[in-house]
A protein has these predicted regions:
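Conserved small-residue
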Residues: 15, 20-23, 28, 227-230, ...
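Extracytoplasmic gating/loop element in the C-terminal half of outer-membrane beta-barrel translocons
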Residues: 88, 364-464, 482
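Short, positively charged
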Residues: 80, 321-325, 420-421
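Conserved SET/PR-domain catalytic core that frames the SAM/AdoMet-binding pocket
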Residues: 256, 330, 340-354, 441-446, ...
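Flexible glycine/proline-enriched surface loops and loop-helix/loop-strand junctions
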Residues: 167-168, 329, 340-341, 425
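Glycine-rich, aromatic-lined ligand/substrate-binding cores of catalytic
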Residues: 335-372
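Extracellular/periplasmic, surface-exposed regions of secreted and cell-surface proteins
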Residues: 1-289, 427-510
Length: 510
């Protein structure tokens, strides 16, 4: 039996957006929205050249032509192919930059539908899948056009302020799509009357012409410019296993395990990151390493007399200071990616008659986290001190037993004002934790009222009561986090633990 489907089409989208913003003063939230303005705040804003009003316009245009064909034979062999031709005004003005043809081919072999599998009753499903193609995406934050903005000159007196047009971004007429060749191979298995289901996918992507803001010589008037500056390789796999060990009229137990692995490597990069770009909490991009790699300044102990930390600086010398703007990264230590390499979850559902219990765990591993900065050269009575200071250096000889630096006196602190050793300590190998965790995500208990009871009412068709709790227990996390949550963090470090939530739900169907 042959099955052939074809479709062709055109897609056109446009969007015109206008943005207005203004700052209002004197709005009293606690007094019903009454406005009370002190004229001195307006005077200060005008004299400070503060723009309290702004507006902007954007015009997006997008067009695509596509064709897709699917062919299947006897539900055993399935082939598919797609061709697209996309264009947008968000990219460079050159035609070769704005317009791009992409394609994809895929095939599937349903082995379980073959005639030689008819006698194999314990195999319910067995199929192989594969696809390969060229894909493309558009970086929504990038713009190829020159950007001019209207600003006021910075003048001390109001009658001297003038309106000027400032160049904010340079044009890049050759800015084009981010592209990638993607290979995907998969297998689907169902065994023993679907008591065991396995889905496995392996994928590999070679990305090129990736877009980012690239530092340049500033000859054109701006220091940064959007450009296609990098190539990257990424690969991984996704595994899903479903098992039903018990399946009877009154008893049922179903278990589902999911596991994903992803790794990346930048194979070509035109950027020149500084030390700070690579050691901050959000990670940096460096050729030969994963996207979002976290590096650290190498910590080399504490000074015997002062307890001030020592490091290997940008020149390879052990010293108190490190120049964060240096582009020599040879002496940094690679910690790992900030994004987890392994992610997954494990769900178990137990049912006895009309009562069911679900337990869901999540986990991740393979990433590193920069701990939030906690050390300064000097402190005051207003500073909140971390408990880590209980283990700080306090007298000569303590450097043999602790890696926590001292709180120095005023004279010693004055000598380090231009060196910032404590800031370097915040970004050293001592201030890194593993992002691995295992979490009891949810537990829910549901009771469904039996159908024969509901039939007596002649009104209700379904009634169930559910009691659930989420974020109940962080089973494992790195002790260096001191209770902070490794799953949710940003450029400022890690977030506080998620709050536990409990819900009761009553569902009634008529």
């Amino acid at each position: 039996m042959h099955d052939l489907n074809m479709i062709a089409g055109v897609q056109v989208k446009y969007a015109d957006r206008q943005k207005f913003s203004n700052t209002g003063y004197g709005y009293q939230y606690n007094e019903g929205g009454k406005v009370t303005v002190d004229y001195r705040i307006m005077k200060m804003m005008i004299e400070s050249n503060f723009d309290y009003y702004g507006m902007g316009t954007t015009r997006d245009r997008f067009a695509a032509f596509y064709f897709n064909a699917d062919y299947g034979f006897d539900s055993r062999y399935i082939f598919s192919g797609t061709v697209r031709y996309d264009g947008t005004n968000a990219l460079g003005s050159n035609r070769s930059a704005r317009w791009l043809p992409t394609w994809n081919v895929s095939a599937k072999w349903n082995i379980s539908n073959e005639h030689f599998m008819e006698s194999t009753e314990w195999i319910d499903q067995l199929s192989l899948r594969g696809s390969y193609g060229l894909t493309a995406s558009m970086n929504s934050s990038a713009s190829a056009s020159a950007k001019f903005v209207n600003e006021n000159t910075k003048r001390p007196y109001g009658n001297e302020i003038e309106s000027v047009i400032t160049l904010e971004a340079l044009e890049n007429s050759e800015l084009t799509w981010e592209k990638g060749h993607v290979l995907n191979l998969g297998i689907d298995i169902g065994l023993f009357n679907r008591r065991l289901d396995v889905i496995f996918d392996y994928w590999r992507r070679n990305s090129f012409d990736l877009i980012a803001s690239l530092k340049n010589s500033a000859i054109g008037g701006t220091l940064y410019k959007y450009a296609n500056y990098a190539d990257m390789e990424s690969r991984g796999y996704d595994l899903a296993i479903g098992i039903t060990p018990i399946r009877t009229k009154d008893w049922n137990w179903k278990s589902n395990l999911t596991l994903g692995y992803t790794t990346t490597k930048i194979t070509n990069s035109k950027n020149m990151p500084s030390i700070y770009n690579m050691i901050n909490a959000s990670g940096g991009n460096r050729e030969g390493y994963p996207v979002g790699s976290l590096f650290s300044i190498q910590y080399k102990g504490l000074e015997h007399d002062t307890g001030v930390p020592l490091f290997i600086n940008e020149s390879g010398v052990i010293a108190n200071s490190v120049y964060f703007q240096s582009t020599n990264l040879d002496y940094l230590k690679y910690e790992g990616p900030i994004d987890p390499e392994y992610t997954g979850g494990w769900s178990n559902t137990f049912r006895w008659k009309d009562l069911s219990l679900n337990v869901f765990l999540t986990f991740q591993a393979g990433n590193k986290i920069r701990l939030a900065p906690a050390f300064k050269t000097s402190y005051s009575e207003l500073d909140a001190m971390s408990s880590v200071f209980f283990d700080r250096w306090m007298q000569p000889g303590d450097e043999k037993y602790t890696n926590v630096p001292s709180i120095v006196d005023v004279l010693t602190a004055d000598g380090f004002k231009s060196k910032y050793p404590y800031n370097s300590y915040n970004y050293s190998t001592e201030r890194v934790a593993k992002g691995d965790f295992i979490r009891l995500k949810t537990i829910s208990l549901t009771y469904k009222v039996p159908k024969h009871y509901l039939q007596r009412t002649k009104v209700l068709s379904d009634v169930s009561l559910t009691v659930a709790g989420s974020n109940l227990w962080l089973i494992y996390a790195d002790k260096k986090l001191n209770g902070q949550d490794p799953e949710f963090y940003n450029t400022g470090g890690v977030a506080q633990p998620l709050s536990r939530q409990f819900t009761i739900a009553l569902n009634i169907g008529f």
